[in-house]
Amino acid sequence: MKVVQLKIENFRGIESAELKFDGHALLVGSNNVGKSTICEALDLLLGPDRLNRFPPIEEYDFYNGRYLQPAQVEGEDPTPVKIRVEALLTDLSAEVLKRCAKHLEFWHIAEKRLLTEGEVKAATPGISIPCLRLETVGEYDPAEDEFNAETFYIHSPDAIEGEKETVRRDIKRLFGFLYLRALRTGSRALSLERGSLLDVLLRLQKVRTGLWEQTISRLKGLDIENDAAELEPVLTAIEERLSSYVPASKAGRKTKLYVSQLTREHLRKTMAFFLAMRDDQEAVPFQQAGTGTLNTLVLALLSFIAELKPDSVIFAMEEPEITVQPHTQRRIADYLLTHTKQAFVTSHSPYVIERFTPENTFLLARAGSGKLEAMCVADATGLKENDYKRYSRRGLSECMLGKGVIIVEGSTEYHALPVLARCLEGEDSALNPLDLAGVSIFDAESDSQIPKFAKFFQALGLKTFGFYDVKQRDATEKAKFAAVLDVNEEHKYKGFEQMLAAEVPVTRLRAFLQDLLDSGVDAAHYKIPTTLPTDDAAIKKLIVNVLSSTKGAGWSARLLEQCQSSERPTTAVEFLKKIYTYFPLPVVTPATGASAQTP
């Protein structure tokens, strides 16, 4: 079972969205762009337990909290605004095909569209496949003063005209949808509350009825008072005083202590999952375990569920990387990709992002105030899949999540420019720090690769800034750089090291070299004379050789850290200042009165 189309209207922070998927989907984007809302919308539509809570939706489940449209004519009643979530499902299981047969339609495989009336010849294997369209509609009911939501079959041939048949809860269970809101806590996933992972497991194993009956029976037979003799006189005194106000005809004891209310619902809330992770450790409540252990335990439960329903599991999972080490992050991602029919994952981790192909990675962005759009990364032309995989963890993933990217051609610039930026930001409070602005630095490893990566980032909607060495280039080659860079900085030097040698004062260069000698560096290996030359030209030549060595990238950053404001390389400083103009500091109204006082 797979979701290939998803439409959302007036739900949470999304006024409208029409998304298309082909298998697994990694959802990336800035905070509050709508990643979690997509997962919540899927849960509203496919989750078997989501609509059974009361109320199923609330005021702020509506876009901007608007659940009533003001009347156009004075005196008329306002019109309820409707939440709509629609999905088209393919790869249906045999049981779904059987039980939902009259609601089936057909999906054209090659053209990726729904067959319409008059296309009966296309409804054949190889050309099209059966599909199922579902829709959840939620609205406010003024008459009852409550919010309602229901899921329907869009194709309902047997329904009364203008109406649709509802999707029952037992049918939704066949879809196998599981939504893990976050791995950051197992407090609900590892409880026995309705809809929790343990509850799902018990339902799949068909052991829930026996569990509750046997547990309630054993708890009834547990005599707490027998093991606590000091309770006897207290309970007797309570009964005597109670009889003074409420006559009781029951003979013998009228009060008794139990460890719970002896109901299923109360037991669901009170039963706890214990675990022990070491030989010297007694079992403790799972809440007392480390967060990383909890998250891994949740993954174990998910894998168990997937094994029980191998052909019909759709996972929606938020940020699986929370408090989990990198190798576990990769394992979680690999498991989802190989053991589920479809997985919807939100993540900011390069270790998770690198596991998804460009075809399965979607960058979410706002087109206007409430419209959400998703761009498939594979559609960002100019970057081969091998390049995507190679550079994914080396900065590509971070850049994709930002608003701008500085593309450089080597490790020296990659390490030095962030240091220079921090120095400028530390001295000028009017500058918006690049980290906060969402600007990353990406090492393309050579100037020839800058246009390729810039084109990729530009297609994703990022601002692109290039900083590279001078070189003999014809007009066509120069045009490639200019076409994809918002700031196209080809400086006049043959290398970043030459720029530092030319623009940083010689006194600072000499002091830096002396500092290296004093730190105990292997002077012979790096060809630094123990007595520095007095000639300025010799110092500049020496600094170029030293910074071009294997440790040169880190040393270039170290040199810039030691520079005073007037000693910094003008070319690099002016380049960064151009970038700051694209990301002005947000205006913050200063606090006044008592709130402005420091406690």
Where are these regions (language model features)?
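Switch/communication elements of ASCE P-loop NTPase nucleotide-binding domains
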Residues: M1-G47, F273-E398, T570, T581-P599
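Acidic, Mg2+-coordinating catalytic modules of nucleic-acid enzymes
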Residues: R394-I407, S411-P599
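Electropositive, glycine-dotted interaction segments
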Residues: L92-L211
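Conserved P-loop NTP-binding catalytic core
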Residues: E40-S128
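Extended helical coiled-coil dimerization/tether regions that scaffold
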Residues: A189-L192, D199-L297, L301-V313, T476
